[in-house]
């Protein structure tokens, strides 16, 4: 069992878990405030990855700079989608079940469009670039510069968003909307404005995650689907709409995947992830960190 004490595995688990947490943050913001199931979330990660790739390859712009542009582009796409499509859906005040069903279909269509456009523009070939790929030995653990930067930036963004939600006026408004939309409106929260902010911020975080992932992974037009699945598993584990719970669940999923594969085989990766997912749904459907709702 010496493998469990491996610093190399610990580092890999932290990087993967923090990445899952960051991706799931954006998905959780959109679902928590609006009950919309964004199955195109991973395709926004793909969009951010291609922005970083092309800017670095053709203009030698560092991904640490292009991540801001990727975030703005993805957030702008989110704002357009909200104003053009989802604002009217939300204004109709449909039931949560109907909203989820409608959003599932709409986002699925958006996902197909984004994947096909990316395939036409960038082709389906795998692409990659070398950035901060020097290997450093820290405490006996070998780590590349890009993965170390990725870990530090991902943790920083998660901490910054948590502080934003706890300390800023708009952050508190988002939390109020997550808890109860009607009550938030009664106390003066501009629901439509906060929904637009959450939608744009959720999309932007996915674009940001894509640029960080592109520094150490190959990218393709169809790279987003596994990240979408992982993000949904994370928000189920952490509790739907539970932002801190989602961060903890992302880290937990990263550890389960890395250590589970190390103890078994890479071929069991999907079995491990979906096994945990199904087990939580059966035993604790509100999530590991969610609160049980009592209906009276």
Where are these regions (language model features)?
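Inter-helical junctions in multi-pass inner-membrane proteins, predominant
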Residues: 2-12, 165-169, 196-235, 241, ...
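Single transmembrane alpha-helix segments in multi-pass membrane proteins
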Residues: 5-57, 86-98, 239-240
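Membrane-interfacial amphipathic/re-entrant helices at transmembrane-helix boundaries
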Residues: 1-23, 51, 63-66, 93-104, ...
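Cytosolic-side transmembrane-helix boundaries in multi-pass membrane proteins
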Residues: 94, 179, 186, 190-193, ...
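Pore- or pathway-lining transmembrane helices of multi-pass membrane proteins that form conduits
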Residues: 47, 54, 90-118, 224-236, ...
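Transmembrane helix-bundle core of multi-pass membrane transporters
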Residues: 89, 98-167, 194, 259, ...
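Alpha-helical transmembrane segments within multi-pass membrane transporters and channels
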Residues: 60-110, 248-253, 257, 284-285
